[in-house]
Amino acid sequence: MSEPKQAKRYIVSGSVQGVGFRYFTQNAAERLHLSGYAKNLPDGRVEVYAIGTPEQLAKLRSALERGPWGASVSEVREEQAAIDPNYANGFVITY
C-alpha cells in the first residue's frame, strides 16, 4: 500500500534567483514524480509548492537545500499546505 499524499510549501532564501533554481527544482520534482510549482517571489526568494508522499517531499527538500551550481541557499522554510487540485498533475514553473 502506498503512502498517502500531502502538500508542502517551501520558501527558499539566499542567492536563488537568476541561477536556474526553478528549473533545477522542476527537474528534481519530475525525477521524484512530484506535482506542484516553483516561482520567484518579488523579495528574491523562491516559493516551491509540491504534492507527494512524505518520502518524496523529504528528498525534494534535500535537493532544495543543495540547489543548483551557482546558487547559495541560506534557508529552506517548510510548512504543511492543503492539496490544490490545480497543481495535482505535473510540476510547472509559474510567474
Regions found by a protein language model. Name each.
Residues M1-Y95:
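Intrinsically disordered, low-complexity, mixed-charge
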